[in-house]
Amino acid sequence: MAANILVIHGPNLNLLGRREPAVYGQTTLEDINRNLTVKAQAAPVALSIFQSNAEHELIDRVQGAMSDGTDFIIINPAALTHTSIALRDALAATSLPFVEIHLSNVYARESFRRTSYFSDIAVGVISGLGAAGYELALQFALTR
């Protein structure tokens, strides 16, 4: 079981619940984080949560996972999914297992959203299950 799990939320996820609720749902990022924290405490595992709209801050946090005891990463790269080779390289450099999360079904949206720089190096991808995708990723991490 992964004892130290890092959850990373990418750009614009701080707007969840207000930004395009028909696409991303009514659940706020605070709701998601609170729910994950409760589940992690019950497990019990250490859970760290980080959100940034800045690519370099996300990269710095991923690189930090190499030396802070992180065992597993749950990441929603958001729009960086389709653009950030640098974030992909940081994840690859850690050699840590990670699950890629998307709240919406990226395959049912615009064609550019169907390209991910992360999926081929992730241990799994969860797409289109809304906030429940985070819970499923945490449940999976707890079995690793």
Swiss-Prot record:
Pathway where this protein functions: Metabolic intermediate biosynthesis; chorismate biosynthesis; chorismate from D-erythrose 4-phosphate and phosphoenolpyruvate: step 3/7
InterPro entries reported in the protein's UniProt record: DHquinase_II, DHquinase_II_CS, DHquinase_II_sf
Keywords: Amino-acid biosynthesis, Aromatic amino acid biosynthesis, Lyase
Residues given in the record as substrate binding sites: N76, H82, D89, L103, S104, R113
EC primary class: lyase
PROSITE patterns linked to this entry: DEHYDROQUINASE_II
Catalytic activities: 3-dehydroquinate = 3-dehydroshikimate + H2O
Listed PANTHER family: CATABOLIC 3-DEHYDROQUINASE
Stated role: Catalyzes a trans-dehydration via an enolate intermediate.
NCBIfam families named in the record: aroQ (TIGR01088), PRK05395.1-1 (NF003804), PRK05395.1-2 (NF003805), PRK05395.1-3 (NF003806), PRK05395.1-4 (NF003807)
Designated name of the protein: 3-dehydroquinate dehydratase
